[in-house]
């Protein structure tokens, strides 16, 4: 069997395909999963999508155009919450509240939070379309944003797949070091 034939069973990963699959999976009742040592209810609370007028007002308030994949997400669901209450992707109102509260560069908007990781997840609005424009920052401890090398679509797919965990840190161990030059 050729690789192309096997790939017919898979779909192109787009914001629309991710959210469609999420909505279908979300309709399953009483699903529990293993999550960091315990069973938790699996599911998502999806908000009503933002209107074109709400999106225009949002872009006007922040002074930047948002990436098309992120705009597509907001049109489908203006934010979503994980039912384990650990992570969420913010709605426009919450984004604007963060925009006013936190002293971040104006081109960095907080779009998601992860409580267990104590992180804000942001889009760099100065990045070009479909660029690695997603960053994380600890709002208390960090002096800088760290790129997680994803555009919004890739971030959304991974963040939902791992149920809001900080997947960008998996496998990262700064305590295990090896000298690159033998002494």
Where are the regions that the model predicts?
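Long, low-complexity, intrinsically disordered segments enriched in glycines and aromatic residues
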Residues: 76-183
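A surface-exposed partner-binding patch
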Residues: 1-121
């Amino acid at each position: 069997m050729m690789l192309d034939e096997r790939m017919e069973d898979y779909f192109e990963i787009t914001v629309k395909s991710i959210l469609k699959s999420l909505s279908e999976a979300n309709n399953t009742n009483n699903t529990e999963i293993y999550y960091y040592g315990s069973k938790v209810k699996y599911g998502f609370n999806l908000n009503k999508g933002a209107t074109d007028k709400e999106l225009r007002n949002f872009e006007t308030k922040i002074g930047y155009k948002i990436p098309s994949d992120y705009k597509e997400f907001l049109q489908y669901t203006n934010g979503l919450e994980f039912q384990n209450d650990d992570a969420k992707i913010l709605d426009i109102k919450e984004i604007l509240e963060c925009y006013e509260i936190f002293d971040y560069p104006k081109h960095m908007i907080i779009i998601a939070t992860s409580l267990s990781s104590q992180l804000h997840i942001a889009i760099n609005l100065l990045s070009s379309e479909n660029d690695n424009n997603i960053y994380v920052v600890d709002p208390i401890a960090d002096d800088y944003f760290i790129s997680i090398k994803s555009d919004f679509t890739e971030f959304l797919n991974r963040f939902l797949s791992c149920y809001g965990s900080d997947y960008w840190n998996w496998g990262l161990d700064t305590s295990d070091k090896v000298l690159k030059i033998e002494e």
